């Protein structure tokens, strides 16, 4: 089966400041299934992705860790690639936006936009952190909501009342980075004149390049009016400098989608493929992007407009999916449902999740819910109970009674043809991204096979030596029907398909390889292809993921007059200092300990604190706290602890002390 079609497929680029979680995997599994489907059809289908490696969050996290942004993003990229490989997500090339290819393409596109009159310069006012000497993105300013007076709200929207506003509207604004009150400063920024392309975008968005619900949503944005898009950021910033403009950088969202092109460019350079054939304005190839609904605005408006304005082709389609919920709710660290890929892999087989997501994904923008009872039932009933059970039951007889050799003919050609007749419908469902429909059809076929085996009862016939030919024919039929089923499931379960190919002693399975059954063919000894999900492993995964509160014994209240009172002179001996947590990591082998690196302004100290069960390491980094700076160092088996952080506890939890806005590392607490 071959085709003249040529396709390039991408997934949204994971941000390079943290590990993958199950929410990421929805999209990447969805993309991988679609790509595998087309490759099995003989289509040249190239899939590329990479890490989104620029921006303020990466710059600040690297600073907190005491490493360069390049070192941080390189480490995270390795983690992402390792997780993708474990889940059998097989990109033809996986790159990074911090690459020579991306810088060259971003510069080319910017210069073309500038030459075409699409870049506008405007002076804007924004918050500036006088301590860090940097302009602050919206999410790095917090304060009191101007609408409902809720405290500790971000600079772009209130999580209590839902209001949106400018950071300068906040009451008592504070820099999240330094804790000081920011000041307003002017800066000249570069804008892409998106409204110039409103008619082009209206036409493009209504020509079948998007799902209907996405097109309808975009209509609302058109009615509200498109706005010029700020594509520049001020130094300090981790990204690409704007050519010829001192201290100005391309905004991460300008070069991030260009990263698709850069990853493909690297692929082309290494394999001798024509980049222009796929990206030229007159290209006859197909270009598909898979994205989440939270970034539709960038991919369905900015991206096609920017491509068209700079002389490149626009996407054939942008396919949008919904969010992942767990047990009907948003993923939550406190409930243990914010599950990283590596936590899942420590307890469960990756193809359980590939199958479950496939069974629930369709071509719409619906959210997908991971319900663990449903997860267990689907995997155990469908994969183990229906599909694998067919091979297991039939192979046992073939291996033991017939020297691993199948019989020379099928005994129910009609049933074989019946399963083959589902092929086009299954392929259509996968191509339409309605994987749930494909899975339903495949399981309907599996039911027919199990009914056939149950009706013929080879285990009963095997007791009669005169019936062994019938047993041989029935089990040969079962093995061949299993071969059809595993071919249909191959885009979803590539690891199980490969193991099945080894068991069947066959060439790699393709959509047309099942036209001829395996007859008078020697198979290999059957080995278990998949085992049942154990609920205990799910519970262990949730425990590992959970940000549970530490519980401590409740002490009886003691009257103040009975306490061991100290003098003011004794208290003065304790050197309490404001400290900034620049790094935090759990201590392996210790249930409670977290290793903290604390910045005191003129020095750094290492402290081991018993807060591991109360906080995630990531949420501690960058916070200010209070420490005892002159405590005698204590040698522990994990290292030397050079102080103590202060925390409050009520027997139900533990809470780090945090100073008020304006406090700086090294300040003395009096």
Curated annotation (Swiss-Prot):
One of its GO terms (molecular function) is ATP binding. GO terms for biological process: methionyl-tRNA aminoacylation. This is Methionine--tRNA ligase. ATP binds at residue 333. Its EC number is 6.1.1.10. The lineage of its organism: Bacteria, Pseudomonadati, Pseudomonadota, Gammaproteobacteria, Legionellales. It comes from Legionella pneumophila subsp. pneumophila (strain Philadelphia 1 / ATCC 33152 / DSM 7513). It is found in: Cytoplasm. Is required not only for elongation of protein synthesis but also for the initiation of all mRNA translation through initiator tRNA(fMet) aminoacylation. It holds the Pfam family Anticodon_3. It catalyses: tRNA(Met) + L-methionine + ATP = L-methionyl-tRNA(Met) + AMP + diphosphate. Zn(2+) binds at residues 145, 148, 158, 161.
């Amino acid at each position: 089966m071959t085709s003249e079609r040529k396709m390039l497929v991408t997934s949204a680029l994971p941000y390079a400041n943290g590990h993958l979680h199950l929410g990421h995997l929805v999209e990447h599994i969805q993309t991988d299934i679609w790509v595998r489907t087309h490759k099995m059809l003989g289509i040249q289908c190239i899939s590329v992705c990479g890490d989104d490696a620029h921006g303020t969050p990466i710059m600040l996290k690297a600073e907190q860790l005491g490493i360069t942004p390049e070192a941080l993003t390189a480490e995270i990229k390795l983690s992402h690639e390792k997780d993708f490989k474990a889940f059998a997500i097989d990109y033809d090339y996986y790159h990074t936006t911090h690459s020579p290819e991306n810088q060259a393409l971003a510069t080319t596109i910017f210069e073309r936009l500038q030459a075409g009159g699409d870049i506008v310069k405007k002076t804007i006012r924004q918050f500036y952190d006088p301590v860090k000497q940097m302009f602050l993105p919206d999410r790095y300013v917090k304060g009191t909501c101007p609408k409902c007076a809720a405290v500790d709200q971000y600079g772009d929207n209130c999580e209590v009342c839902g209001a949106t506003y400018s950071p300068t509207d906040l009451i008592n604004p504070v820099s999240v980075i330094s804790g000081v009150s920011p000041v307003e400063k002017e800066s000249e920024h570069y804008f892409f004149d998106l409204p110039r392309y409103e008619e082009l975008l209206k036409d493009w968005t209504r020509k079948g390049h998007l799902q209907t619900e996405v097109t309808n949503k975009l209509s609302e944005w058109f009615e509200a009016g498109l706005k010029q898009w700020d594509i520049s950021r001020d130094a300090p910033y981790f990204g690409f400098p704007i050519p010829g403009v001192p201290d100005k950088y391309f905004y991460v969202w300008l070069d991030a989608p260009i990263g698709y092109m850069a990853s493909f460019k690297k692929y082309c350079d290494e394999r001798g493929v024509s980049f222009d054939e796929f990206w030229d304005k007159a290209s006859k190839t197909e270009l598909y992007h898979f994205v989440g609904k939270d970034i539709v605005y960038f991919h369905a408006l900015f991206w096609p407009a920017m491509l068209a304005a700079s002389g490149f082709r626009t996407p054939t389609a942008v396919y949008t999916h919904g969010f992942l919920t767990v047990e009907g709710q948003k993923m939550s660290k406190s409930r243990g449902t914010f599950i990283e890929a590596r936590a899942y892999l420590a307890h469960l087989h990756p193809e359980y999740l590939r199958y479950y997501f496939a069974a629930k994904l369709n071509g719409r923008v619906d959210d997908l819910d991971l319900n663990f009872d449903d997860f267990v039932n689907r995997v155990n009933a469908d994969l183990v109970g229906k599909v694998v059970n067919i091979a297991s039951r039939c192979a046992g007889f073939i291996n033991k009674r017939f020297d691993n050799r199948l019989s020379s003919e099928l005994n129910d050609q009609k049933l074989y043809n019946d399963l083959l007749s589902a092929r086009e419908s299954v392929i259509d469902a996968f191509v339409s991204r309605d994987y749930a429909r494909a899975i339903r059809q495949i399981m309907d076929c599996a039911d027919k096979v199990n009914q056939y085996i149950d009706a013929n009862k080879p285990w009963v016939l095997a007791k009669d030596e005169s019936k062994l030919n019938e047993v041989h024919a029935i089990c040969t039929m079962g093995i061949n029907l299993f071969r059809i089923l595993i071919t249909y499931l191959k885009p979803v379960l590539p690891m199980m398909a490969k193991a099945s190919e080894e068991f069947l002693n066959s060439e790699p399975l393709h959509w047309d390889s099942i036209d001829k059954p395996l007859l008078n063919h020697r198979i290999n000894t059957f080995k278990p292809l998949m085992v049942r999900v154990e609920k205990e492993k799910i519970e262990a995964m949730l425990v590992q993921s959970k940000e549970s509160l530490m519980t401590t014994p409740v002490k009886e209240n003691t009257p103040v007059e009975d306490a061991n009172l100290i003098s003011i002179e004794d208290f003065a001996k304790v050197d309490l200092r404001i400290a900034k947590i620049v790094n935090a990591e759990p201590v392996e082998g210790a249930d409670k300990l977290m290793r903290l690196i604390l910045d005191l302004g003129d020095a750094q100290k290492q402290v081991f604190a018993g807060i591991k069960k109360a906080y995630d390491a990531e949420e501690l980094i960058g916070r200010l706290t209070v420490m005892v700076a002159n405590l005698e160092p204590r040698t522990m088996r994990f290292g030397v602890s050079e102080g103590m952080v202060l925390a409050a506890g009520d027997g139900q939890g533990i809470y780090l002390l945090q100073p008020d806005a304006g406090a700086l590392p090294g300040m003395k607490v009096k």
